[in-house]
Amino acid sequence: NPEEAVCGGIITILVDGDPLANMQAYREMEQGIRAGQPGVLVTRVVPWNDTQVLIKRCWATGHCDLQLPGNEMQRIKQEVNSILLSGNRSDYRQLDIAIPGEQEMVKVFLEPVFPPQHLIIAGAGHVGRAVSHQGKLLGFEVTVIDDRVEYANSINLPDADNIVVRDIGQAIQELPKDRDTYIVIVTRGHSHDADALRPCIGSQAAYVGMMGSRIKVAKMHEEFIAKGWATEEQWNSICTPVGIEIGSVTVEEIAVSIAAQLIKYRGNRGPSVKK
């Protein structure tokens, strides 16, 4: 009843009564996600009667035959390419297609499916552990790096998908850093922070944040500029001190402020409000 809806709106729910009929699409989607490849799930909905519809799904980068006119399939492919090029995870689209000889329009839904974005945390101490937990809640694939096995282990880091025990700077140097990569540096000291930060300078990472006092950050800024490790523009792209200003005091509060900043950057809503 629309009058009883809290939001005051109306929602239509599509229930797939025979999901096994589209298992090939689901398998191809799973394979794509495991391989780290984005794709689009295409769903064709054909009215059957007043309350039922016929559903056919395909994974757009796999075998996709929706039994539609050729020009309409070409239109769908163009829409799929547009979604993938945009990289927008919320770019859901609906197409209404007229079929010759049919009165009802065929609806086609396009749902982008992207692999999880990657959160790399340099440092497995108290803050790294808390940020790992927050990152997992936000849907990131979480990798934590530390050279201390007593910290870099599954007992201390139960939320981490990947735990790397080795030199922090070398590990970050070798890991891919693209626009779906978010890097948080929370190591145990100045030299380790510098080692972790240097490979991030000039990378394509969507976000690089480093924890530290304003005094420490100022000293590192001076060092990086003086040694030619970063330009002023590159340094200014780093979120340091890390996190959004919410008066954080405890480790957990600091992790929440960092998580909030990650959300802000992931949503492409402009630079952090951290001053």
Predicted region positions:
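Conserved SAM/SAH-binding loop
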Residues: 166-171, 191
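Short, well-ordered alpha-helical microsegments
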Residues: 128-129, 193-194, 217
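Segments forming oxygen-rich coordination pockets for charged ligands
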Residues: 1-147, 151, 155, 161-164, ...
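Short, structured coil segments at secondary-structure junctions
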Residues: 158-160, 203-204
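ADP-ribose/adenylate-binding Rossmann-like module
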Residues: 145, 182, 187-190, 198-223
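Short amphipathic alpha-helical segments
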Residues: 132-134, 156-157, 176-177, 195-199, ...
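Short amphipathic alpha-helix with an adjacent loop that forms part of the alpha/beta core around
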Residues: 169-179
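Adenosine-phosphate binding glycine-rich loop
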Residues: 210-275
